[in-house]
């Protein structure tokens, strides 16, 4: 039984595990600015943007007027605590 568990752990480490996250996408990690959206859009813009970032889906979160994505890859930049820095290139 222990041998089987060891093989399973080695298999996971060897082939990796793809994790996904739900969060606000940002244009670049350095700028940390959420993507604005039109709250009257029928969620088409954000869904297309999120799918372009390889997410499962997305919508315009109306209270923040920002796109929110479901199922983003782990390496996709998302909003962190801190302010937006629009002047950073």
UniProtKB/Swiss-Prot annotation:
Alphabetical keyword list: Disulfide bond, Ion channel impairing toxin, Neurotoxin, Secreted, Signal, Toxin, Voltage-gated sodium channel impairing toxin
Described function: Inhibits voltage-gated sodium channels (Nav).
Expression (tissue specificity): Expressed by the venom gland.
Pfam families for the chain: Toxin_3
Signal peptide location: 1-19
Main localization of the protein described in the UniProt heading: secreted
Origin species: Tityus obscurus (Amazonian scorpion)
Family annotation (InterPro entries): LCN-type_CS_alpha_beta_dom, Scorpion_toxin-like, Scorpion_toxin-like_sf, Scorpion_toxinL, Scorpion_toxinL/defensin
GO molecular function: sodium channel inhibitor activity; toxin activity
Cross-referenced CDD domains: neurotoxins_LC_scorpion
Subcellular location: Secreted
Note on domains (UniProt): Has the structural arrangement of an alpha-helix connected to antiparallel beta-sheets by disulfide bonds (CS-alpha/beta).
BP term (GO), one: defense response
UniProt protein name: Toxin To14
Gene Ontology cellular-component annotations: extracellular region
LCN-type CS-alpha/beta domain mapped to chain residues: 21-85
Family the entry assigns: Belongs to the long (4 C-C) scorpion toxin superfamily. Sodium channel inhibitor family.
Disulfide bonds: 33-84, 37-60, 46-67, 50-69
């Amino acid at each position: 039984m222990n041998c089987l568990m060891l093989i399973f752990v080695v298999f996971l480490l060897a082939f990796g595990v793809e994790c996904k996250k739900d969060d606000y996408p940002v244009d670049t990690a350095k700028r940390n600015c959420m993507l604005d959206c039109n709250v009257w859009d029928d969620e088409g813009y954000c869904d297309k943007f999120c799918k372009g970032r390889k997410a499962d889906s997305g919508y315009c979160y109306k209270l923040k007027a920002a796109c929110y994505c479901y199922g983003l890859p782990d390496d996709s930049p998302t909003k962190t605590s801190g302010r937006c820095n629009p002047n950073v290139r």
